[in-house]
């Protein structure tokens, strides 16, 4: 039944390609629409994959990504409100030496691997056209392209924040639209060879600083800095930045030799819904965008894709077509509350470390030290980070 049905995925970034690849096994015809495929899709970021996310991707045929990822065995949290300290306040680790807390992979590597697989599939089509309009037909969504060609689809998936204008007719509702008044600066440190299997989060007074281990000689940095912070001076000059990291973190990296290009991103907490969700779904940052403090953004997107697969299998077993009202409702019921609760939890963690009161900071630091001794609570945190929240 499915081989006569069509899905349109709008957006050819990592989210769009991942959806297309994971849905390709359903014998659906899938069009990936992008206005400009020639535009370079270079993403400088490294992605944190939970063990659960990576295991699922491997199960769907992306087995090579495990070899191309760097394993995380430890996660250290440092409350550095008063000053930068390398002594951790909270430590997460794996009990089994063969296991991992998470994995770090280059987003371009993952993108290239999925793209190559898609190019070899006969039910995947890349359309390099601009969309003029999207309208309802009796049993389809009708997409009209700028060249006036029309195509009907059982389901339309928005997978790129570049297509917000097309969503206006679907009555996009911003459930949450909050600015953190800070920017994330993303870059890589190239350093001497070390045993690099620990991720670290330093909660500085003006924003969190995260280290993600990429290889024995490379570490990815995500530094969130308040708009009015004095720390902006460091990221504006590589010479100052290199000196800053060598002064404060030499014990971790021996010597930092160089720093890559610095990329800047505005940080927001966004949670969107469609009032008119007939045969239409959203994935990725166009649906929900969270603070990178816990490295959970991409895992959240993957969990949503896996939920869609589960719902499609359910509809297939009942003989229902893709995009029907039951599928849309069941998917939204499975994901919306979980996503909102999880995103709110991440936002709450950011708030906890955003309070600039000395007495509060003292209590917070003591609380982290006490949590470090509670293995039950720590294991629950690890499980939530690995598999998400399911309510």
Regions found by a protein language model. Name each.
Residues 45-69:
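N-terminal glycine-rich dinucleotide-binding loop that anchors FAD/FMN and/or NAD(P) in oxidoreductases
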Residues 1-13:
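Beta1/beta-strand and adjacent pyrophosphate-binding region of the FAD-binding site
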Residues 10, 24-45:
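Glycine-rich FAD pyrophosphate-binding loop
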Residues 16-17:
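N-terminal Rossmann-fold NAD(P) dinucleotide-binding loop
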Residues 2, 55-59, 70-169, 178-182:
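Conserved N-terminal helical subregion
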Residues 152, 159-253, 262:
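Conserved FAD-binding catalytic core of PHBH/FMO-like flavoproteins
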Residues 310-391:
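C-terminal helical "tail/cap" subdomain of flavin- and related membrane-associated enzymes
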Residues 231-316, 323-326:
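FAD/FMN-dependent oxidoreductases across multiple families
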């Amino acid at each position: 039944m499915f081989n006569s049905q069509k899905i349109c995925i709008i957006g050819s970034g990592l989210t769009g390609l991942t959806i297309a690849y994971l849905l390709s096994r359903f014998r659906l015809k899938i069009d990936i629409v992008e206005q400009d495929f020639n535009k370079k899709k270079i993403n400088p970021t490294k992605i944190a994959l939970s063990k659960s996310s990576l295991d699922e991707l491997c199960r769907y045929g992306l087995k090579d990504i495990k070899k191309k990822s760097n394993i995380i065995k430890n996660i250290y949290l440092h409350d550095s409100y008063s000053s930068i300290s390398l002594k951790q306040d909270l430590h997460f680790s794996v009990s089994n030496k063969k296991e991992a807390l998470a994995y770090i992979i280059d987003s371009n590597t993952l993108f290239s691997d999925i793209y190559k697989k898609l190019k070899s599939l006969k039910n995947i089509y890349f359309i390099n056209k601009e969309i003029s309009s999207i309208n309802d037909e009796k049993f389809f969504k009708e997409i009209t392209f700028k060249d006036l060609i029309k195509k009907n689809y059982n389901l339309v998936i928005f997978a790129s924040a570049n297509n917000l204008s097309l969503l206006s007719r679907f009555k996009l509702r911003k459930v949450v639209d909050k600015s953190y008044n800070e920017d994330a600066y993303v870059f890589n440190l190239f350093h001497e060879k070390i045993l690099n299997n620990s991720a670290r989060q330093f909660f500085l007074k003006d924003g969190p600083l995260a280290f993600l281990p990429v290889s024995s000689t490379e570490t990815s940095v995500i530094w969130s800095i308040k708009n009015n912070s004095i720390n902006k001076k460091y990221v504006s000059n590589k010479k100052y930045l290199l000196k800053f990291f060598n002064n404060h973190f030499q014990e971790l990296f021996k010597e930092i030799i160089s720093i890559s290009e610095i990329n800047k991103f505005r940080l927001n907490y966004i949670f969107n819904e469609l009032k008119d969700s007939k045969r239409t779904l959203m994935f990725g940052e166009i649906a929900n965008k969270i603070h990178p403090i816990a490295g959970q953004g991409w895992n959240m997107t993957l969990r949503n894709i896996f939920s869609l697969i589960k719902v499609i299998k359910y509809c297939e077993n009942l003989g229902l077509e893709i995009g029907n009202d039951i599928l849309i409702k069941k998917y939204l019921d499975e994901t919306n509350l979980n996503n909102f609760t999880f995103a709110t939890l991440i936002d709450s963690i950011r708030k906890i470390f955003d309070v600039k009161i000395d007495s509060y900071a003292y209590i917070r630091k003591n609380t982290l030290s006490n949590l470090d001794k509670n293995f039950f609570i720590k294991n629950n945190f690890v499980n939530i980070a690995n598999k998400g929240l399911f309510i």
